[in-house]
């Protein structure tokens, strides 16, 4: 794919959709990251549907792009963070992020606290602490997977939302802070295995953090 091909395809999409569309950027060697200028052009042409972006370009590129996208308001409507919230606090404070689109529903109580503290202007001085607790939960890199899902599924199972910890796992996957990425489209279903010691630590962390949120 080229930038021109991406824009042509999305131009056709803009002609048929009737509701807001959130574009998600990415880090891929197979497809170029859509140019910010492209998003702006499309948002001008289709103001009722386009102008929403979940920014997940690689590393600091996501931050730089977010600043440019937010500078293009009101043509651009809303710019959201991604990558499991790893850079969310920085992006809230300095890049114009207006929310988080993520699979990390297992940590909803913490994510809610982070957002509410930010909305209040951090007048209680608890925003950094709340984000630090979130990072503690999601940064157990030596636990199974350590990517986007993996041991996080244990919390959903613990709360009775999931009946098991079976998840899609990419073959030849590499783990990064943004999740698990594989080559090609090959994947398998696998159950996340957690040792008794790891389970005890996750239970302890989760209980302590929920207790802190009740204060």
Regions found by a protein language model. Give the residues of each.
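Catalytic alpha/beta core domains of metabolic enzymes, predominantly
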Residues: 12-17, 27-146
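Glycine-rich phosphate-binding "P-loop"
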Residues: 23-28, 49, 167-170
